[in-house]
Design a protein with these regions (language model features):
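Noncatalytic alpha-helical scaffold of FAD-dependent oxidoreductases
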Residues: 1-151
């Protein structure tokens, strides 16, 4: 499973130590760094508000799924997730397996005035999968279970 707060998979160790020379160069160029606190997944899950969505068979509303779909992979996203400074989450996440299910979800979103965020691999670095604060509920549609493109 993909890391909830960074690149890689949960079973990968991507930890690297900076050499003393590189650390000195970075300090000379940008100043001394300040380490962020490291939040646990459970700490971030505890911050997830109640969903504003009604039950739907294709939509997951559990807090962990919502955390895992709350941000992309930009540096600001990493810093927010790593430190636990996340303030918006989708209200629900759907993982359709067919074009019929996608149509059903979009019709449901239209009928219920939901904001829809399309989610591919979750690697966005431009912020478009991050829910903005809104009075309308947010539905993220994760296309990860779709296995082909049709023309």
């Amino acid at each position: 499973m993909r890391l909830w707060n960074g690149w890689g998979n949960e079973d990968s160790d991507l930890t690297m130590e900076l050499s003393d020379g590189l650390r000195a160069l970075l300090e000379a160029l940008v100043g001394p760094g300040t380490a962020l606190s490291q939040a646990t997944l459970n700490e971030v899950i505890a911050k997830v508000p109640n969903t504003r969505l009604d039950d739907h068979p294709l939509i997951k509303t559990d807090p962990e799924t919502r955390v895992r779909h709350a941000r992309g992979q930009s540096l600001p996203d990493w810093l927010e997730m790593h430190s636990g400074n996340v303030d918006t989450f989708p209200d629900g996440v759907a993982l359709p397996e067919s074009s019929e299910q996608v149509r059903e979800l979009l019709a449901h979103a239209k009928e219920n005035n939901l904001i829809v965020i399309p989610y591919g691999g979750g690697t966005s670095v431009v912020g478009h999968i991050n829910p903005e604060t809104s009075d309308k509920p947010v539905l993220t549609i994760d296309m990860g279970k779709m296995n082909s493109m049709l023309s």
